[in-house]
């Protein structure tokens, strides 16, 4: 039994140096030992330490021989051996997740700053609303607004320096002043339109009343009795080109319409052609 264990241990010990000699004789081969030989070497050293720590008995020798015989040299090493090596390498997914987590942390850190900036702006607006101007400042601003409703940057800076204000405060005052002026002008326009609408409504009522009266007068029979002849109708200025035909001479009209009397027993009349005859003379 001791011979078998020594022989097995010797063969395991000689195989590893032979591998090293072959590597030295062949420089083209990589000097780094393969994972299988390295794992085999670790198993052999672990087995030797295990057998040395176990007491020298028949049962322990049988268990050791069974354990050693169960080792397959040609079997590829298990993935557990590379657990330490794989633990040091991070996967792309983990890298992406870690970078995403860091980015979210940075965004969370920057959010309070943004909210503080917004609150500062709101506070600034409140401070601008609380601005109180003196009478002199208001008078100067009003006079300047009458001359120029808008200011360029240079005029704004000069006016702010003159009044002891900031340029932003002057700009806000002019914006509010323009808004008030526009509102007043809108109110004036609305009042003017309201009056025009009232006048048009009143005129419409008057015209509707006249139309109703004319319709009632047209339907009554007295309208035709008191109607004036067409010759006495007055023409509107737009219809002056339609003129009434001039009246004909009274003599020509009477001669044209005069009828001759017919008398069967009247004496003979002279014909206009100079011939005379006896009307209804009895024959002899």
Swiss-Prot record:
Residue ranges for the region (Leucine-zipper) are: 193-214
Q: Which residues bind DNA?
A: 126-185
The annotated consequence of residue 176 to A reads: Abolishes DNA-binding
Compositional bias of kind Polar residues: 48-59
- Compositional bias, Low complexity, is annotated for 89-100
Picking any one GO biological process from the record gives: negative regulation of DNA-templated transcription
Residues making up the signal peptide according to the UniProt record: none
Tissue expression notes: Predominantly expressed in leaves and stems.
Pfam families according to UniProt: HALZ (PF02183), HD-ZIP_N (PF04618), Homeodomain (PF00046)
Q: What induces it?
A: Rapidly and strongly induced by lowering the ratio of red to far-red light.
> Where the protein is mainly located, per its record?
nucleus
Q: Name one GO cellular component term.
A: nucleus
Region of interest called Disordered, as start-end residue ranges on this chain: 48-132
Keyword entries, A-Z: Developmental protein, DNA-binding, Homeobox, Nucleus, Phytochrome signaling pathway, Repressor, Transcription, Transcription regulation
Matching PROSITE patterns, A to Z?
Answer: HOMEOBOX_1, HOMEOBOX_2
The consequence of residue 180 to A is: Abolishes DNA-binding
Q: Which family does it belong to?
A: Belongs to the HD-ZIP homeobox family. Class II subfamily.
PANTHER family assigned: HOMEOBOX-LEUCINE ZIPPER PROTEIN HAT14, HOMEOBOX-LEUCINE ZIPPER PROTEIN HAT4
What does the UniProt record say this protein does? Probable transcription factor involved in the negative regulation of cell elongation and specific cell proliferation processes such as lateral root formation and secondary growth of the vascular system. Acts as a mediator of the red/far-red light effects on leaf cell expansion in the shading response. Binds to the DNA sequence 5'-CAAT[GC]ATTG-3'. Negatively regulates its own expression.
Q: How does it assemble?
A: Interacts with DNA as homodimer.
User: Could you tell me what this protein is called?
Assistant: Homeobox-leucine zipper protein HAT4
- Organism of derivation: Arabidopsis thaliana
């Amino acid at each position: 039994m001791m011979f078998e264990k020594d022989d097995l241990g010797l063969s395991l010990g000689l195989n590893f140096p032979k591998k090293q000699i072959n590597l030295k004789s062949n420089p083209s081969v990589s000097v780094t030992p393969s994972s299988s030989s390295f794992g085999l070497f670790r198993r052999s050293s672990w087995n030797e330490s295990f057998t040395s720590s176990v007491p020298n008995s028949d049962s322990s020798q049988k268990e050791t021989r069974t354990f050693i015989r169960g080792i397959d040299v040609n079997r590829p090493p298990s993935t557990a051996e590379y657990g330490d090596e794989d633990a040091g390498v991070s996967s792309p997914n983990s890298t992406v997740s870690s970078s995403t987590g860091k980015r979210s942390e940075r965004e969370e850190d920057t959010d309070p700053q943004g909210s503080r900036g917004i609150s500062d702006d709101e506070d600034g607006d409140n401070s601008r609303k609380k601005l109180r101007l003196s009478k002199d400042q208001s008078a100067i601003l009003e006079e300047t607004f009458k001359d120029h409703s808008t200011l360029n940057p240079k005029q704004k800076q000069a006016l702010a320096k003159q009044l002891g204000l900031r340029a932003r405060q002057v700009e806000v005052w002019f914006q509010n002043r323009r808004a008030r002026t526009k509102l007043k002008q809108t109110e004036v326009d609305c009042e003017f339109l309201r009056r025009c609408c009232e006048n048009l409504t009143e005129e419409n009522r008057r015209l509707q009343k006249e139309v109703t009266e004319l319709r009632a007068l047209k339907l009554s029979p007295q309208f035709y009795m008191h109607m004036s002849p067409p010759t006495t109708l007055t023409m509107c200025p737009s219809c002056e080109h339609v003129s009434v035909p001039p009246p004909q001479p009274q003599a020509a009209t009477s001669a044209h319409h005069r009828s001759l009397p017919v008398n069967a027993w009247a004496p003979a009349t002279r014909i206009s052609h100079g011939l005379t005859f006896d009307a209804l003379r009895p024959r002899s």
